[in-house]
Amino acid sequence: MNVYRTHLCNELREEHIDQTVTLSGWVYRKRDHGKIIFVDLRDHYGITQLVFNDSDTTIFQLITTLRLESVITIKGIVKARDSSTINETLDTGSIEVIVSSINIETASDILPINIASMQDYSEDIRLTYRFLDLRRDKVKNNIILRSKVITEIRKSMENMGFIEIQTPILTSSSPEGARDYLVPSRIHHGKFYALPQAPQLFKQLLMVSGFDKYFQIAPCFRDEDARADRSPGEFYQLDIEMSFVTQEDIFNIIEPLMINIFSKFSSKTINKEFPKISYHDAMLYYGSDKPDLRNPLVIQDVTEIFRDSEFKIFNSNIKQGMVVRAIPAPNTAHNPRSFFDSKIEFAKTLGAQGLGYITFIDDSLAKGPIAKFLDKDRLDNIKLICNIKAGDSVFFVSEIADKAALFAGEVRTLLGKELNLIEENTFKFCWVIDFPYFKYDHKEKSINFFHNPFSMPQGGLEALENQDPLNILAYQYDIVCNGIEISSGAIRNHKLNIMYKAFSIAGYTKEMVDEKFKALTRAFKFGAPPHGGIAPGIDRIVMLLADVPNIREVICFPLNQSGEDLLMGSPSEIDNDHLKLLSLNIIKKT
């Protein structure tokens, strides 16, 4: 191959025995047996066992003192291993290389991370020495998986007739809802670029430009706090937009793409049919707009059962406009009191006043703090609606609808985990559809967009003119897998009169819309096709495929939870000359 290697460290087999070879790589492990030292030499592709003996004292002394993770180039002769030492777990496990010469390319310092160890290290250590962390198989394999997934996505998109187009990184502030990263302009005094939260406007403009099917693996930047499924700062998405499409057309593109990717890169099962769940039903039955369908528990509304009942607390709540939601807990009726108390305390940590519960000991006996206030008909209705059998329990939460959904959803998730109800080794996809178009901001006492302001309202202009805004639905959709939102998307509003009307309900004048989104409104005056799109998150897809709990495990050089790059030392201060050049002044926080 070249002066550094004739073979890779995963290549040598019995057919290479007695050949002279050159290998290069990192000293992965050393085993000192007195007059013989065994070294596992590692490169990107695999491991080869090297043998150093004391017949050459110079070489032997070098390898004796050399630290792990030093980089070496060796020459040697391939030999068969003794049958008792064959390592079936290695591709090269039937051979070893007797070293005749060695060149130390670079010697390693004392390691802050043991590459060969399964030891857990703090995230700060791992990210500060990320170049070492990436040498570990598990982390490296996540990054390789990411590369393969992106390659497969590109092939699939091209096969479906999509064109890959790169959109600008330096742009103007966007309406996605998160905070922008701003870049001051040196030339245009007092003005700023923004890093794109998403290529939203550009991809819509591409449709107006006449492109039919667009995609890109798009970098996006949002000044958000970190979560397990969200990396602060930068993330990547498969950005897609199509002209002359309906919502179903988008689904018909994404579903086979997801099935292909998840089937190709995981041995887990995947549902071939993606159920469609309205936002209303998702919040009612699962307590989340990101329902985890691996959890079989289904929340039920039992408000009418408690209306005018003897249980005064719930009855009073109902008269004040609150609801009652029931969360089944199978096979828990005989659990100790501590089981039920722990769920009550959990609900309180969420902000709920508590939880009620009933245990159905057998077909005729119900116990618990609430049971004595309900007659047989009401108890039977609870059993029927919640699909309860003897030996099951039911928890109840009573709150205003939004809070009841939140609390019930969290309790459902907790019960699913504690009772080992979550179906393992499977991917459960679903679509969440029919999102509200508007929402009421209680703090600002105003109506605002629920999600994407550029989506088409269901019912069009007529709905905007004649319906209660809070009852209007949008052509918006999310694709969810195992409780994680993979992507949001929408059929876009391509008609200016509908756009102006929608924004006016949210408090924007026509002039404000034209000023804020002038490129889009100008373009829509010259023939805009119906269009829609979606943008599955690359990081989240790979996180699910790699089966890791944290999205930073599948990003090569991630920021930490505080939004810091510990490896490169950013964000960092800049000198006064640079500040002056950009006409900036740092105001100290008080």
UniProtKB/Swiss-Prot annotation:
Name a GO molecular-function annotation. Answer: nucleic acid binding
Q: Which residues bind ATP?
A: 222-224, 485, 537-540
Gene Ontology, cellular component aspect = cytoplasm
Domain of life, source organism: Bacteria
What EC class is this?
ligase
Q: Which residue ranges does the record annotate as region Aspartate?
A: 200-203
Q: Which residues bind L-aspartate?
A: 176, 222, 451, 492
The subunit field of the Swiss-Prot or TrEMBL record says:
Homodimer.
Identify this protein by name: Aspartate--tRNA(Asp/Asn) ligase
Gene label: aspS
